[in-house]
């Protein structure tokens, strides 16, 4: 009976070591992938989306105040540029081979972009846009991914 207990303990320890080793290997692989992938297109897309939201809010505020101020925007070229940034962003995120690594990429974008936010509202817009990206890119919501690592 003692031999069986020792054998079970050894097998459990071996499983733990293998699992830990695989996790470390996965983390190292993700770090390498994040160093190789260029997330600039994702950052640009997010910047454009937040700017667009702010412009829409300003337009609504003007309308509520009764100011008839027409803003001429070059929608077609702007939308085309946004679409191109989004397509390239999705390609970059799809290059990452796991949801955990994709989550790390979104967290990395949040960390770099949140420094430029002016207030909590912009941070929330940033979080919201980053949370939408996986669905927009077609690989669904990321499970257990907290975009803002400070809130963990």
From Swiss-Prot:
The keyword Protein biosynthesis is assigned to this record: no
Signal peptide residues on this chain, from the entry's feature table: 1-22
Top-level taxon of the source organism: Eukaryota
Single GO term (MF): nutrient reservoir activity
Main localization, broad class: endoplasmic reticulum
Key words of the record: Allergen, Disulfide bond, Endoplasmic reticulum, Signal
InterPro entries registered for this protein in UniProt: Bifun_inhib/LTP/seed_sf (IPR036312), Bifunc_inhib/LTP/seed_store (IPR016140), Napin/2SS/CON (IPR000617)
Location in the cell: Endoplasmic reticulum
Tissue-specific expression: Expressed in developing cotyledons and in the embryonic axis of germinating seeds.
Disulfide bond sites: 30-101, 42-89, 90-137, 90-137, 103-145
Cellular component, GO annotation: endoplasmic reticulum
UniProt-listed SMART domains: AAI
Annotated family: Belongs to the 2S seed storage albumins family.
Oligomeric form and interacting partners: Heterodimer of a small chain and a large chain; disulfide-linked.
Protein name: Conglutin delta 1
Source organism (scientific name): Lupinus angustifolius (Narrow-leaved blue lupine)
């Amino acid at each position: 009976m003692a031999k069986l207990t020792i054998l079970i303990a050894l097998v459990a320890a071996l499983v733990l070591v293998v699992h830990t080793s695989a996790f470390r290997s996965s983390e190292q692989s993700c770090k390498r992938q994040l160093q190789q992938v260029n997330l600039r297109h994702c950052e640009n897309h997010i910047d454009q989306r937040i700017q667009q939201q702010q412009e829409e809010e300003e337009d609504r505020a003007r309308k509520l105040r009764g100011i008839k101020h027409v803003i001429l925007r070059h929608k077609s070229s702007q939308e085309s540029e946004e679409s191109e940034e989004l397509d390239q962003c999705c390609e970059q995120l799809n290059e990452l081979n796991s949801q955990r690594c994709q989550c790390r990429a979104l967290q990395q974008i949040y960390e770099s972009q949140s420094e430029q936010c002016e207030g909590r509202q912009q941070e929330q817009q940033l979080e919201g846009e980053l949370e939408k990206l996986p669905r927009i890119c077609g690989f669904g919501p990321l499970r257990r991914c907290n975009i803002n690592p400070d809130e963990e």
